[in-house]
């Protein structure tokens, strides 16, 4: 069953359907419809944030759902499914894969990533767990710890990982050449060409979110691009 889910992702597009509180599309109903549209378009899986969103999306789509819950805890950097409380809710909501922060930062309660994963696997031995990492070293460690999938989600979003304008192709390729766990490319992928390049670098599948499901960011990108360009004088005066 676990391998069946993983195999469905191979060489495919995973669409991240997430809207943060305060954004116009912040609604389980809207995210479920967005996920359905992604499935119709050929997405192989959905990445979703929040109990209500996961429940609503699972009712709409037949493809796998990668679930997470973003929650901040004072004094701790990890915010992607950082404790067992969030893990329990993600699994209760019906997610097929649970994504967690797998960086070197301690989780709430002082747990290491390895200790946290052990607790998850002891309670839910059949659930697939995705490691959201930010560096090559974290990816290598994630395989050693026993994660089922590794995603480059947090590259550029930790204090010690490189800030890049585009996808972290170097990280994708280095991990793909070294580990046997599927590498999922995520982060700053805006075009089909960038998605294909990530696969060419060894990614097992590609996650695209903002470029598909956050229209205010897509609009802002167009507006910024237009404002930064100079125009010809071919228009009639």
Curated annotation (Swiss-Prot):
UniProt pathway annotation: Amino-sugar metabolism; N-acetylneuraminate degradation; D-fructose 6-phosphate from N-acetylneuraminate: step 3/5
Origin organism lineage: Bacteria, Bacillati, Bacillota, Clostridia, Thermoanaerobacterales
HAMAP family the UniProt entry points to: ManNAc6P_epimer
Organism per entry: Caldanaerobacter subterraneus subsp. tengcongensis (strain DSM 15242 / JCM 11007 / NBRC 100824 / MB4)
GO cellular component labels: cytosol
Family: Belongs to the NanE family.
Keywords, comma-separated and alphabetical: Carbohydrate metabolism, Isomerase
Record-given protein name: Putative N-acetylmannosamine-6-phosphate 2-epimerase
EC annotation from Swiss-Prot or TrEMBL: 5.1.3.9
Functional description taken from the UniProt entry: Converts N-acetylmannosamine-6-phosphate (ManNAc-6-P) to N-acetylglucosamine-6-phosphate (GlcNAc-6-P).
SUPFAM superfamilies: Ribulose-phoshate binding barrel
Domain of life of the native organism: Bacteria
């Amino acid at each position: 069953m676990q391998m069946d889910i993983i195999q469905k992702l191979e060489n495919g597009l995973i669409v991240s359907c997430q809207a943060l509180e305060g954004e116009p599309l912040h609604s389980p109903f809207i995210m479920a419809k967005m996920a359905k549209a992604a499935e119709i378009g050929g997405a192989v899986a959905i990445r979703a944030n929040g109990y209500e969103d996961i429940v609503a999306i699972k009712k709409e789509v037949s493809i796998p759902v990668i679930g997470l819950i973003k929650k901040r805890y004072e004094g701790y950097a990890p915010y992607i499914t950082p404790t067992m409380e969030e893990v329990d809710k993600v699994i209760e909501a019906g997610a097929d894969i649970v994504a967690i922060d797998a960086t070197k930062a301690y989780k709430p309660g002082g747990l290491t990533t390895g200790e946290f994963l052990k607790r998850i696997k002891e309670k839910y031995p059949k659930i697939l767990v995705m490691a959201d990492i930010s560096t090559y070293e974290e990816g290598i460690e994630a395989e050693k710890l026993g994660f089922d999938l590794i995603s480059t989600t947090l590259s550029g979003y930790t204090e010690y990982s490189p800030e890049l304008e585009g996808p972290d192709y170097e990280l994708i390729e280095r991990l793909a050449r070294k580990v046997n766990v599927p590498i999922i490319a995520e982060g700053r992928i805006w075009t089909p060409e960038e998605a294909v390049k990530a696969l060419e670098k060894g990614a097992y599948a590609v996650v695209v979110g903002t470029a598909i499901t956050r229209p205010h960011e897509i609009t802002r990108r167009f507006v910024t691009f237009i404002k930064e360009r100079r125009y010809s004088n071919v228009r009639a005066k």
